[in-house]
A protein has these predicted regions:
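Carboxylate-rich, polar loop motifs that coordinate divalent cations or form catalytic acidic clusters
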Residues: 1-168
């Protein structure tokens, strides 16, 4: 963990570095670190979300960080006194943003949904999110959430050899 990340685009045969600058992060150095599970906003091709190992969830639009969802504006919590891990980020077919927080069983409701109607708000708070628990699921950094665009089924696994498969 704590690895510096870059974001690049490919046009034809040319790669261009479009890594966001001045990124709010736990390290405090303005650098994007430890990206997990990037996903494009289905309503805006210039916007994407990236989970992170230390600093929650980033919303990036036109190559700039426009939001960092952390403990101050989401239900995310600090785990083990040092990290806020978001290993899985997805959109459902209605445009709702789903995230899972890896918390080693320390959070009651580690599955979180930011409804489409709230995503454009400037001041998003924890109360804007819907939270839920999933009995039997170990929300760890290997967990994965997939959402079918045609059926809207949600599949989750914790990524371990003894994993359960949950269908919502």
């Amino acid at each position: 963990y704590n690895k510096v990340a870059t974001v690049n685009t490919l046009e034809g045969s040319t790669w261009t570095d479009v890594t966001p600058q001045n990124v709010p992060s736990k390290a405090g150095d303005g650098v994007l670190r430890d990206p997990l599970s990037p996903v494009f906003d289905p309503d805006d091709p210039n916007t994407y979300y990236i989970g992170s190992w230390l600093s929650g969830l980033y919303k990036i639009s036109n190559d700039e960080v426009v939001a960092n969802y952390f403990t101050n504006n989401s239900p995310l919590q600090i785990y083990n006194n040092w990290s806020c891990i978001v290993p899985s980020v997805q959109f459902d077919r209605d445009g709702n943003l789903w995230i899972a927080e890896a918390a080693g069983g320390t959070i009651d409701k580690p599955l979180m949904i930011l409804p489409r109607s709230k995503q454009q708000n400037v001041d998003i708070s924890a109360s804007d999110w819907i939270t839920m628990s999933v009995p039997g699921m170990n929300f760890n950094f290997k967990m994965h959430l997939m959402i079918s665009p045609s059926t809207n089924y949600k599949l989750m696994t914790d990524g371990t050899w003894s994993s359960v498969l949950v269908v919502l």
